[in-house]
């Protein structure tokens, strides 16, 4: 069953085509990747899917809902979560508070109750803390709960970003270059982590990534962009044999 459908979506910036008639279908409980050279339009597609930017044409459907014109917060509330290429953590807050904030749109108490510390607020705060600890423990981060993110290694900060993205219990997780800045050992750990998340949470994951080892090893379906246009899609084996893809991005097949 499909969880996400992109029907011929397009986006222009000042007359320059960033994404042109791009279509894809993401099946439930699967991992896919969108790859391509710098400036190919990969992150723009994520921005369009999440409502950060508006389509010029085309349609977006998520879990059977037409989300083409929905604002970002309503799309998130339907069960979509995202990480970013550049780590976006609150370094003045503790690790656990960073995770709590990620559940913000699900907090139901109002300003009056919060100001006067009503029982419902205390109960919800307790539940929020417990859920945040469970989320940290899921990715083996619970021992860092009271620390500041700046005290963590870069690899652990990346994992913390994943924890934040998992806090709202998404149906679809979008990972924007999760391997950026990681060393080979951290890349292998990341691959294991993504597989673990997908298998345990039973969610769909779409990855935008430059690191080919990561993509080829964990993504059964790959879409390739060049100058905003899709030039290939298929399995890692099919992508590795696609002449247009090799010419545009991958280089020699020995590099795959």
Residue ranges and their predicted role:
Residues 1-256:
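Glycine-rich phosphate-binding loops of nucleotide-dependent enzymes
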């Amino acid at each position: 069953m499909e969880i996400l459908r992109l029907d011929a979506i397009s986006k222009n910036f000042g007359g320059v085509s960033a994404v042109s008639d791009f279509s894809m279908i993401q099946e439930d409980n699967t991992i896919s990747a969108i790859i391509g050279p710098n400036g190919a339009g990969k992150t723009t597609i994520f921005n369009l899917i999440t409502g950060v930017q508006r389509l010029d044409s085309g349609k977006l459907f998520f879990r059977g809902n037409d989300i083409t014109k929905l604002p970002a917060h309503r799309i998130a509330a339907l069960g979509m979560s995202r990480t970013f290429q550049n780590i976006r953590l609150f370094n003045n807050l503790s690790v656990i508070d960073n995770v709590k904030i990620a559940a913000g749109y699900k907090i139901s108490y109002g300003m009056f109750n919060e100001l006067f510390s009503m029982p419902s607020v205390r109960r919800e705060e307790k539940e929020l803390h417990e859920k945040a600890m469970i989320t940290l423990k899921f990715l083996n981060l619970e021992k860092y709960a009271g620390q500041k993110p700046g005290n963590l290694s870069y690899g652990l900060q990346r994992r913390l970003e994943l924890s934040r993205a998992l806090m709202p219990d998404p149906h679809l997780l979008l990972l924007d270059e999760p391997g950026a800045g990681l060393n080979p050992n951290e890349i292998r750990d990341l691959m294991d982590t993504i597989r673990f998340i997908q298998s345990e949470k039973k969610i769909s994951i779409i990855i935008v990534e430059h690191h080919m080892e990561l993509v080829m090893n964990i993504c059964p379906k790959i879409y390739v962009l060049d100058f905003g246009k899709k030039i290939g899609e298929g399995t890692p084996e099919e992508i590795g044999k696609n002449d247009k893809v090799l010419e545009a991005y991958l280089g020699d097949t020995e590099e795959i």
